[in-house]
A protein has these predicted regions:
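Vicinal oxygen chelate
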Residues: 1-49, 53-82, 92-115
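C-terminal catalytic core of tyrosine-transesterase DNA break-rejoin enzymes
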Residues: 85
Length: 115
């Protein structure tokens, strides 16, 4: 629903059985944007059939890339963007079924390479 000033008064989208409502900043509804230049402490994670397409659409819509799409050791392909309001969004798709044993081994290798 458009706001009188041309902004977004109300928008919603459905992810599985979860409905998410968003709007532009509006003091009368206690909807405040974060101070410019900051990033929210939360991360919205969206499972999708096509991580790369979701990432590309977000970038074209004005999001900033924080991590380009890449395969992760736990079997997902994921990317992270920051929207113009400072919120981070992760797009993920399952690309490989990883056994618990392989996951433990890969996690050990991943975290040992970070020290």
């Amino acid at each position: 629903m458009p706001a009188p000033d041309g902004g977004v008064a109300h928008a919603e989208f459905l992810v599985g059985n979860t409905r998410i409502y968003i709007s532009d900043e509006a003091e009368e509804w206690h909807a405040f944007a974060m101070p410019e230049g900051t990033t929210a402490s939360c991360l919205f994670s969206i499972m999708t059939a096509d991580c790369d397409s979701a990432y590309d659409r977000a970038i074209k819509a004005g999001a900033e890339s924080m991590r380009e799409p890449e395969n992760q050791f736990w079997g997902m392909r994921s990317a992270i963007v920051k929207d113009p309001y400072g919120y981070r969004w992760s797009f993920s798709q399952m690309v490989e079924d990883v056994s618990p044993e392989d996951l433990a081994k890969r996690a050990q290798e991943f975290f040992s390479s970070k020290t």
